[in-house]
Amino acid sequence: MRVGVLGAKGKVGATMVRAVAAADDLTLSAELDAGDPLSLLTDGNTEVVIDFTHPDVVMGNLEFLIDNGIHAVVGTTGFTAERFQQVESWLVAKPNTSVLIAPNFAIGAVLSMHFAKQAARFFDSAEVIELHHPHKADAPSGTAARTAKLIAEARKGLPPNPDATSTSLPGARGADVDGIPVHAVRLAGLVAHQEVLFGTEGETLTIRHDSLDRTSFVPGVLLAVRRIAERPGLTVGLEPLLDLH
């Protein structure tokens, strides 16, 4: 399988370049960074592209890839409901093309989101804290936003988080994502970390995941690359490939 990498000179992109080059069943067909023409992907007969670029350019990348029938595995963040709808509309004309967009490709992070959804209905309170390096473009992270949405979905019909706060500085209680407070930390020395805190009378539960190195994303990305052709259309999240129930 011929695989191209967009964002190849970034920290995650460079990790993906090395991972693809080291895989016996994959061929690195192109490695592109800012300023490189996307036509290099078609020139190299690329079948699947890994995109770890920037929210400002990812939609243009996807439009090109879909138009050319190239499957896309996307780890770039900043996707909204409107952006997902746009991707789906592009895919209508290319029913055999696949796009997988995931907020996180670390297997442990995907599992932590799954565990959080399972635990959510058993606790009165839930909050999310995400911690990342200071170069991250978006806040809160896509992983934290998705985690909060999964928790809110699991708690549907239950009372909201108890919170007697009547006065606070703007932002002190975090961002409200479907009723779940999400707090973002940006700190030098961090990579990608998340805590989900649950509380009820007499006990708390903390689910924490730490990506200590960007190689933590490699197994999930390569899994998606190898299986993406099985899932025409848009897939959001890595969970469908892990057979989680």
UniProtKB/Swiss-Prot annotation:
GO biological process: diaminopimelate biosynthetic process; lysine biosynthetic process via diaminopimelate
Binding site for NADP(+): 11-12, 75-77, 102-105, 136
Enzyme active site: 132 (proton donor/acceptor), 136 (proton donor)
Localization in the cell: Cytoplasm
Enzyme class: oxidoreductase
Pfam family, one: DapB_N
Binding positions for NAD(+) per the UniProt entry: 11-12, 33, 75-77, 102-105, 136
One Gene Ontology molecular-function label: NADH binding
Matches recorded under Gene3D superfamilies: Dihydrodipicolinate Reductase, domain 2 (3.30.360.10), NAD(P)-binding Rossmann-like Domain (3.40.50.720)
Biological or metabolic pathway of the protein: Amino-acid biosynthesis; L-lysine biosynthesis via DAP pathway; (S)-tetrahydrodipicolinate from L-aspartate: step 4/4
Residue positions binding (S)-2,3,4,5-tetrahydrodipicolinate: 133, 142-143
Reactions that this protein is recorded to catalyse: (S)-2,3,4,5-tetrahydrodipicolinate + NAD(+) + H2O = (2S,4S)-4-hydroxy-2,3,4,5-tetrahydrodipicolinate + NADH + H(+); (S)-2,3,4,5-tetrahydrodipicolinate + NADP(+) + H2O = (2S,4S)-4-hydroxy-2,3,4,5-tetrahydrodipicolinate + NADPH + H(+)
CC annotations in GO: cytosol; peptidoglycan-based cell wall; plasma membrane
UniProt entry tagged with the keyword Cytoplasm: yes
Domain of life where this protein originates: Bacteria
Assigned keywords, A-Z: Amino-acid biosynthesis, Cytoplasm, Diaminopimelate biosynthesis, Lysine biosynthesis, NAD, NADP, Oxidoreductase
EC number(s) stated in the UniProt entry for this protein: 1.17.1.8
SUPFAM superfamilies assigned to the protein according to its UniProt record, in alphabetical order: Glyceraldehyde-3-phosphate dehydrogenase-like, C-terminal domain, NAD(P)-binding Rossmann-fold domains
Function description: Catalyzes the conversion of 4-hydroxy-tetrahydrodipicolinate (HTPA) to tetrahydrodipicolinate. Can use both NADH and NADPH as a reductant, with NADH being 6-fold as effective as NADPH.
Annotated family: Belongs to the DapB family.
Subunit and interaction comment: Homotetramer.
Protein name, entry field: 4-hydroxy-tetrahydrodipicolinate reductase
Origin species: Mycobacterium tuberculosis (strain ATCC 25618 / H37Rv)
Taxonomic lineage of the native organism: Bacteria, Bacillati, Actinomycetota, Actinomycetes, Mycobacteriales
